[in-house]
Every structure is written in C-alpha cells, then in structure tokens.
Amino acid sequence: SDIRRMHMLLDLLKTQGVKAALGFLEKAEDDGRSGERVTNRFLAIPVVHNFRISARDVGELHPKSQKVIDMVGEKIEDNPSTRILIFTEYRYTVNNLIQSLSDIDGVRVSKFIGQSTSGKQKGMTQKQQLARLEEFRSGEVNVLVATSVGEEGLDVPAADLVLMYEPVPSAIRSIQRRGRTARQRSGTVKTLIANDTRDQYVSRAAEIRERKMYSNLADIEQQKQKRLDFRTNM
C-alpha cells in the first residue's frame, strides 16, 4: 500500500540516508515498469515525485555514511593489513558504501551479497561469492560490505573490525555478526544507531532478547546440573 511504502521511504531516510531512499524508489520504478499500477501510483504522489527530482543532485547527508568513512580510514591508516567487515540490511546501502569507501587510500573494497536478483540489483553466483571470500582472506580485498548472507552458512574469514550499519532485531543474528571478528586476536564490533529512529527501538529489543536467551540457557544448564547431581547421589 501507499502508506507502507511511505513508511519504508521515511525509515530509509532516517536510518540509511538519501542514497538508500533513492535506491528504494528506483527499484519501485522498475516494479512499475513491469505493470504494478499500485507502485506507479505511489511514485506519482507529489511529495514522492518532488523528492526524487530534488534529491538526485544532493550528496549523502546522513551522518552514518561519514562515520563509516572515518572509522575505516583510521583503521586502515593504523594497520594497512587489517580486515574490515561491514554489515547492512540493504543492497542500496552496500552500493553506496562501496562508492564512498573506494576513494580512501589503501582501501580495497568489494561487496558480498546473496544470489537472488531483484530488478536491476543482480545477485552473486556461488562461484562469485566463494571467489570474493578468498580475496578477503588473502588481503586482495580488505573491506567487505555484506548483507545478511555474510552472517552464516559460508565460511566468511574473520575480521579485525566489524561494523553494523544498523542494529538487527534478532539476538542470534547479532551474535553471528559479532562472531565474525578475529578469534586469535582482539577484534572490535561497532553498531551505528541513528538517534530518535527505529534503530534505537531495534537495538533495545535485540539487547532484551539476547539477555533473555542467555538467561534461558543458564536455567537449562542449571536444570541439567541438578539432574546430574540427583543421579550421582542415588
């Protein structure tokens, strides 16, 4: 519906930035070309139409983008052999970050996304994914910008710095992302949270779920120990 799409557009503007919002509208335009009249109606809404026109010549205004540029630049300058893994929920943001980070001296950045293709957003084949992971492992690529496909399944090499462009509501997914830091030495994990946006709610929800999960695991372990003690004393 128009309301749902407008909510998504505003959410992207607040948590991701102008470029991601434009990417969302470009995908909607592709859907409209395939005959989705509802999508065409949404794009024709005056405020949406005017935003697309005015935002095309605007640089990225969201502070997250500059924060990533600063952190990556500092990390690479301090240690050129470092590995950095950046997670984001959206392919629009993957493309935007690659474009921004490519201008930094010493940064060899590439993307790591899923295999599905949506509109102009083509996915990666499994062969391409495996080749990209090997490039990251060897150092040919030292900054990898990934969607959720980098969380599990494939053997993603460990990183010295993991940046989460936005928090994720799932405690398990958050733990999996943090688990991508280097195991043999200290790694750093940072999550970018835009104030007064959905980011803050998602971050709090994930923290509560994670605490609850660990509490449940502790209860289970305690019950197992009680049963073990009972059998031992019989």
Where are these regions (language model features)?
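Conserved helicase ATPase core of P-loop NTP-dependent helicases/translocases
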Residues: 83-87, 93-148
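Conserved RecA-like helicase motor core of SF1/SF2 enzymes
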Residues: 114-119, 141-142, 148-184, 194-196
